[in-house]
Swiss-Prot record:
GO terms for molecular function: ATP binding; four-way junction DNA binding; four-way junction helicase activity. This is Holliday junction branch migration complex subunit RuvA. NCBIfam families: ruvA (TIGR00084). The keyword Hydrolase does not apply. The gene is ruvA. It comes from Streptococcus equi subsp. zooepidemicus (strain MGCS10565). The keyword DNA repair applies.
């Protein structure tokens, strides 16, 4: 098992990033690949969780150990796999998640992609009280960059689709942000907050 990787970030796609270490390029699935935009061709440290399946070996990456810890607790719940847990971590509202679990707010939990009533109830049952302290939000994980708005919005929508959100939900998001100028990372964060509000 791997705990973290240090290396040069060489590629960003809608679903994953590539970090080169010792001559090997590691494909790492992350919640919001565009949050790494300003780190291309720079040294990064990514915290990892490895999933080994019969047909694939996958690496899931995180900005911090706290984010990884939330992910690990989520995948311990029956009915939540790594992809769903990553979509939940992507919302970047860990306080809201912890409060919803501790207060049995099933409606809030069902707003996450692929989380139905049974799974939301299981989350409450398995995780209530497991978060000693709500994870800290990292407001300045990485510096922001300015890019062309349409391209950035397209990349954000593509990343949200990769997280499991439906195209019909994202049509409203696209319409809301048309004419604005943000980075893909900022679009994703804002869109996730809107999607969680319902």
């Amino acid at each position: 098992m791997y705990d973290y990787i240090k290396g040069q970030l060489t590629k960003i796609t809608a679903k994953y990033i590539v970090v080169e270490a010792n001559g090997l390029g590691y494909m790492i699935t992350v919640a919001n690949p565009y949050s790494f935009t300003d780190c291309v061709n720079q040294q990064v440290t990514i915290y990892l969780h490895q999933v080994i399946r019969e047909d694939a070996q996958l690496l899931f990456g995180f900005h911090s150990e706290e984010e990884k810890d939330v992910f690990l607790k989520l995948i311990s719940v029956s009915g939540i796999g790594p992809t769903t847990a990553l979509a939940i971590v992507a919302v970047d509202d860990n306080r809201g998640l912890v409060n919803a679990i501790d207060n049995s707010d099933i409606t809030y939990l069902m707003r996450f992609p692929k989380i139905g009533k049974k799974t939301a109830q299981q989350m409450v049952l398995d995780l209530a009280g497991k978060f000693v302290e709500a994870p800290k939000e990292e407001s300045s994980k990485l510096p922001k960059a300015k890019h062309q708005e349409n391209e950035q919005l397209d990349e954000a929508i593509e990343a949200l689709l990769a997280l499991g959100y439906k195209a019909t939900e994202l049509k409203k998001i696209r319409a809301f942000f048309e004419g604005t100028s943000e980075t893909a990372e900022q679009y994703i964060k804002s869109a996730l907050k809107m999607l969680m509000k319902g």
